[in-house]
């Protein structure tokens, strides 16, 4: 995209309330999927359950893709045993809540990110119609089989 067109494009996106740094950061995504699709993704409400080995990398990809509204659920803290497989497990995060740590990281990548942290252990009884319909996308990275089953049933039903 030539410079003048790009400047007009950025100005156009600012009218939709986008932070210019986020747009520049996601320029390659926008070039690939288009501005309308990017706007849909950026404003989607996403729930991520679990921030361990799979969930941590998933969260990083969501934030770096420009998604602004992410709710994360994880009751756990980072431990020594997490260092070999979890992206956010560092000396600084040791014994700290996973949800809080990833939220801080998200703001360093995208200052417009709105991360909601739920420091709780999700139970199968928590999976209700109201719970699943609050989000546009639900990503399951938890290690509780009963929660996984209820979540799949609820998502298919609602």
Language model features by range: what are they?
Residues 54-55:
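Hydrophobic/small residue at the entry helix of a nucleotide-binding pocket
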Residues 67, 72-110:
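Glycine-rich phosphate-binding loop and adjoining beta1-alpha1-beta2 segment
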Residues 119-126:
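Conserved SAM/SAH-binding loop
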Residues 137-158:
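ADP-ribose/adenylate-binding Rossmann-like module
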Residues 20-47:
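N-terminal charged helix/coil linker that caps or initiates catalytic domains
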Residues 41, 131-136:
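A short, aliphatic-rich alpha-helical micro-motif
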Residues 49-50, 73:
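Conserved N-terminal Rossmann-fold NAD(P)-binding element of oxidoreductases
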């Amino acid at each position: 995209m030539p410079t003048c067109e790009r400047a007009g494009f950025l100005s156009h996106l600012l009218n939709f309330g986008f932070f210019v740094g986020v747009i520049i950061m996601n320029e390659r995504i926008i070039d690939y999927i288009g501005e309308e699709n990017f706007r849909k993704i950026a404003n989607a409400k996403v729930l991520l359950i679990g921030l361990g080995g799979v969930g941590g990398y998933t969260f990083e990809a969501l934030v770096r893709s420009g998604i602004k509204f992410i709710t994360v659920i994880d009751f756990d803290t980072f431990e020594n045993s997490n260092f070999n497989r979890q992206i956010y497990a560092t000396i600084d995060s040791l014994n700290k809540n996973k949800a809080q740590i990833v939220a801080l990281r998200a703001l360093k990548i995208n200052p417009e990110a709105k991360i909601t942290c739920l420091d709780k252990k999700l139970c199968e009884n928590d999976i209700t119609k109201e719970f699943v319909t609050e989000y546009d996308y639900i990503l399951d990275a938890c290690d509780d089989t009963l929660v996984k089953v209820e979540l799949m049933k609820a998502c298919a039903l609602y």
